[in-house]
């Protein structure tokens, strides 16, 4: 009910009070009409496939710039579709194995599809791109610590830059004492600095190094990782037996 729908030129625009928007852009031969928050798109004499561009923007400024690029895309949709197909084939070429059974390949494809579909750009309080755990409920649409470590370990093989940035996003909010907090959001007031999650991040960094050999990234992360692990033994080994616990502060 908070979303405002308008038709502007060949685009249907749904604006959210947060500043985010979703646009559906048609070619000029499609007639658009609006009734309330509903719209109708009518093709009078379809002689060829109708292509539509669906876009998500995080601000009005971003939307204005993005919509200017869409006519070029719709004038040559085959080029964009080919680039998209090559992008996905590039992901899969890095994870599918000839020694895997077909049923395992299907699971691998599903895993890649889920990770990439949950990929979100940097915006607001999220200073780097990353992957959200789920869209099932609103509080999952943020970055969570141990989810991010696993996501980064998983994407290291087929999109290492995304894997690196997902880790950086969590360490953007590392506390002065070394703690990496539970979860972060576009609105930092919703961040949870009360809880911690198991420290799987060195595994994720090692996976990135294994697949890229990027020593610069390891050097970048090392001081933060060391501070993080010192925090665990200072603040989470309550009985000083060398085994850390996790929970709330």
Regions found by a protein language model. Give the residues of each.
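Acidic/polar, glycine-enriched structural segments that form the non-catalytic walls/loops
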Residues: 1-141, 215-233
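Aromatic-rich carbohydrate-recognition surfaces in CAZymes
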Residues: 141-249
């Amino acid at each position: 009910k908070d979303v405002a729908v308008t038709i502007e030129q060949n685009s249907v625009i749904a604006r959210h009070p947060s500043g985010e928007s979703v646009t559906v852009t048609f070619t000029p031969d499609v007639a658009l009409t609006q009734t309330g928050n509903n719209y109708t798109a009518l093709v009078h004499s379809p002689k060829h496939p109708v292509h539509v561009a669906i876009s998500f923007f995080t601000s009005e400024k971003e939307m204005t710039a993005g919509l200017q690029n869409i006519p070029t895309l719709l004038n040559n949709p085959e080029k964009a579709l080919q680039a998209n197909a090559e992008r996905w084939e590039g992901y899969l070429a890095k994870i599918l194995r000839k020694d895997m059974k077909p049923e395992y390949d299907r699971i691998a494809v599903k895993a890649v599809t889920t990770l990439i579909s949950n990929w979100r750009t940097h915006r607001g309080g999220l200073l780097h791109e990353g992957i959200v755990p789920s869209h099932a409920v609103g509080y999952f649409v943020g970055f969570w610590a141990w989810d991010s470590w696993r996501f980064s370990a998983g994407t290291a093989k087929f999109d290492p830059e995304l894997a690196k940035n997902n880790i950086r996003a969590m360490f953007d909010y590392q506390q002065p004492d070394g703690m990496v907090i539970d979860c972060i959001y576009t609105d930092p007031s919703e961040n949870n600095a009360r809880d911690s999650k198991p420290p799987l991040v060195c595994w994720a960094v090692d996976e990135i190094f294994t697949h890229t050999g990027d020593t610069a990234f390891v050097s970048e992360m090392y001081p933060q990782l060391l501070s993080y692990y010192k925090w665990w033994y200072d603040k989470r080994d309550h009985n000083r037996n060398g085994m850390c616990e996790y929970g709330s502060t």
